[in-house]
């Protein structure tokens, strides 16, 4: 797994996953509103933990560095989700 993934939970016969990940400053989604992120069709944001407070995500929710997000993803979209969580080379 790429980025700062905290947990992965398989659903069904590995047809889908719930991914819990901390957003890093170099992630392509850091600083963006959920509605502006190009998530694959089979991906839903289930929750956002900001400064210890769990929020129900809406389109205007801005994903910031340090947030913990819970994503539901169909198995076919996992690679793209990993790319969105990926740490860029500038991080090292």
Regions found by a protein language model. Give the residues of each.
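Flexible, Lys/Arg-rich cytosolic regulatory linkers and terminal tails that connect or flank
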Residues: 1-26, 89-92
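Cytosolic Rossmann-like ligand/nucleotide-binding regulatory domains
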Residues: 19-85, 92
């Amino acid at each position: 797994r790429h980025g700062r993934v905290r947990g992965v939970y398989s659903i069904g016969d590995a047809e889908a996953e719930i991914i819990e990940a901390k957003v890093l400053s170099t992630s392509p989604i850091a600083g963006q509103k959920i509605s502006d992120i190009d998530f694959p069709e089979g991906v839903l944001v289930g929750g956002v933990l900001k400064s210890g407070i769990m929020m129900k995500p809406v389109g205007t929710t801005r994903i910031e560095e340090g947030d913990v997000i819970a994503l539901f993803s169909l198995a076919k979209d996992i690679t793209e989700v990993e790319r969105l969580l990926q740490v860029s080379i500038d991080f090292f």
